[in-house]
Amino acid sequence: MSVGLAGGAHTALDEEARAEVDVLNSRLEKTTQLTKKIQSCLNRLETTGKSVQDVAGPLNGETRRLQILGNNVDSVLAAIDRLRQPADSKNDEEQIIRVGPEKAGLSTYLASIKRLGKALAEMQASNLRANQQTMADLSRLIKSGNSQLEHHFETVLRGETPRSVEPLHYITKDKPFPTLPQDKIARLGLIYSYVVESHHNGASELAHIYAEVRGPYLSASLANLAAASVNTAKKKSPDAVYRAGTNGMGTYAQAMEGLFISEYDNVCSVFSREDWGVIFLSTCQTALAEQARCLRELNAHIKSHLNTDCYLAYEITEIISALSGKLETRTGELKGALAAALKPVRETAKSSLAELLEETRRKVGMLQILPSDGAPIPLVSETMQRLQTMVHFLRPISSIMISIGDGGWKANAATNGRSTDAIPSLASFDIGADGKEIFSHYCLDTIEMLLSGLDQKSRVLMKSRAVAGVFMANSVVIIGRMVQTSELNDLLENKLDILEQWRKKATASYTDICKDLSVHLFDTVHTNRTNRPTSGPVDSTSIVKGLGSKDKDKIKEKFTQFNGAFDDMVSRHKSYSMEREVRRIFGEDIRQKLQPLYERFWDRYHEIDKGKGKYVKYDKTSIAAVFASLAS
């Protein structure tokens, strides 16, 4: 029974398993059918997708084109809005322009003009016919605004520009000359910057306005000093020699330097760097023209009083050259203008060197009479005084000397091809040239020319060589003294050999009379006679005793002739007008030539009149005293 139960259980399980298998098979069949349906749907969907893609592709491209077109339309609408905006805001900007920069405020005014300019540029770029009237209105407003800016620029500038200032107030107190206030400079600079940035041709107009306003201020401030420079050159005495620093040109130049540098600072603060030079030169032009006129007047005065006022030309040359250098260093401008103004005076200064030499030569040549006592003439001291005065202007003269070259003052000197249109710089000078050395050569040439001319005249106009010798020696001594007692000594101390040569020549001319006197002191000594002189002491008594009557008469005659000639020489020597040094030199030279001869002759023959003094007027002591008196 248990077996049966077991078999029945197994059968039931099998039936249940078969039933489950049948169910699974049924589900699998349904799944297979469903899969086939899905695959069929996918195939249809793929076919449909391809059809849709074929249709949607062109639609997508068209959509993109429509999007771009839409964006373009939006941009056009925005541009139209912007183009309409200036027209809409024109009334507001016009109100600002009409009010002007003073009331509206410069920054607001400039911003308004800039907006108008930007709007006009955009309208011109669009070139829409509908905007033509608006563009015309904007152009009119901009033109009016620029005109008001120029007027405001001039108004501000004139408001801060006095008619003139008193330069001496700033010079004497060592104060800087006034410049424009910083707030006004800022306003002027803003206006100029706008004009330059907008490429408006008003920049040149503003520069013209600036020069037109500030130029007369500079000229008026310097006018009195220019007049003073001319007036102080006028002479109360025609023969008065110009003294350094007595003309007003130094103060004039000092004021010009201060005013010009202050004005240059103004120009640099207002205008662009590339415009500084042109505007500064234009502003200073009137003052420079006045200075040039002043220098021409002074030059005419100097040329008409060259002997006494040539030194003013040297001083002016130094002053203006220094002014040019300072302004060139500070501004880089005006060198050419100042050189052109100085040129007439500088040329006069250069030519004066040769002209003064020629004038001295002419004065020597015109001498018709010379002092009969050999006294010096004023021309000698006048010539040396001129050289002494020149030393006081050694710096400008050194510059001129280098410019004309060594010997350039001589009549036949070449011009060396140097240009005279500019103030000389170091580059224009000969390398190694020494202006002081060249000037010393000029001094020596002057002295040599003077002495040569006087020597020739003395030979013609004076009665004797002795008087000519006195005259020349006096001249030499005066020249030497005036060199040694002045600043000329530093230049000529070791170069006065020519004076020593002329002194010896003059001494020889004067003491030539000693030859005539010495003839009376020569005797004939016969060495072949028994009474010839011995080497021991001279015995006058024995010598006289040994003379024959004819020889004694000759000795007496020699004493007599010597006495007369010697007294005459002493008398004339004392009558001559001699400088102390000349009298000493001549007296000593005569003593050296005659005293030894006379003492020898006296030693041998003084017993000829046995001490009566009839023939032997002087013994050795008395004649020594006379010789000593000649030198004192």
Swiss-Prot record:
Keywords: Exocytosis, Protein transport, Transport. This is Exocyst complex protein EXO70. Belongs to the EXO70 family. The keyword Methyltransferase does not apply. It is found in: Bud; Bud neck. The gene is EXO70. Gene3D superfamilies: Exocyst complex component Exo70. One of its GO terms (molecular function) is phosphatidylinositol-4,5-bisphosphate binding. Pfam families: Exo70_C, Exo70_N. Its main location: other. One of its GO terms (biological process) is exocytosis. SUPFAM superfamilies: Cullin repeat-like. Involved in the secretory pathway as part of the exocyst complex which tethers secretory vesicles to the sites of exocytosis. Also plays a role in the assembly of the exocyst. It comes from Gibberella zeae (strain ATCC MYA-4620 / CBS 123657 / FGSC 9075 / NRRL 31084 / PH-1) (Wheat head blight fungus).
